[in-house]
Swiss-Prot record:
Residues recorded with modification Phosphoserine: 105
Organism per entry: Rattus norvegicus (Rat)
Region of interest (Disordered), ranges: 25-116
Membrane recorded as keyword: no
Keyword set includes Phosphoprotein: yes
PANTHER family (UniProt xref): C9ORF40 ISOFORM 1, CHROMOSOME 9 C9ORF40 HOMOLOG
Recorded coiled-coil stretches: none
Protein name: Uncharacterized protein C9orf40 homolog
Keywords, in A-Z order: Phosphoprotein
Length: 166
């Protein structure tokens, strides 16, 4: 069994990420492998390569300067990353009044964020993933005349009366 590289993504992209990228004319690749020059696949016969910091094995657990790597971890599938959720903060203005500010974003960006958040939950609804219903031809329903409708109702009433008499 082949070993999976740690740099490969575990899951495919979720639909809400596609919404954010829909403004671009061409879609970016799903995964770009790291450059091969930084880390060779096999060890070289050179003893000098072991002393280089680039060839040193990376730690899987523990502290370090790898904060961007750890940002996306710990999320459920389909959950937006926490960095994009601007929670409002209350701050005192110089005039003494309270005002609500978003975390590092202008008011227009909050509206855009809420729009993306709504779209994210729209993709997770049961109705979105169901197969679409075939189109209904309303002209077939309009062809029914009022006379045929009343005749049908009268026929049903006669059947009910007969059933009740017996």
């Amino acid at each position: 069994m082949a070993k999976r590289r740690a740099a490969e993504p575990l899951t495919f992209r979720v639909p809400w990420k596609r919404l954010l990228l829909s403004d671009f004319p061409e879609e970016p690749p799903l995964w770009v492998p790291p450059s091969g020059a930084a880390r060779p696949l096999k060890r070289q016969g050179d003893a000098g390569t072991m002393a280089e910091p680039a060839s040193a094995p990376r730690k899987r657990r523990g502290g370090g300067d790898d904060e961007p790597e750890l940002q996306g971890r710990g999320l459920e599938p389909g959950e937006p990353p926490p960095g994009e959720q601007g929670e409002p903060q209350v701050s005192r203005a110089a005039g003494g009044g309270d005002r609500v500010e978003s975390a590092g974003s202008p008011q227009g960006a909050d509206e855009v964020h809420s729009q993306h958040n709504e779209d994210f939950w729209q993709y997770n609804t049961f109705q979105y993933w169901r197969n679409p219903l075939p189109p209904i031809d309303l002209a077939a329903l309009e062809d029914v005349s009022a006379n045929s409708l009343t005749e049908t109702l009268e026929d049903k009433n006669e059947g009910v009366e007969i059933d009740m008499e017996s």
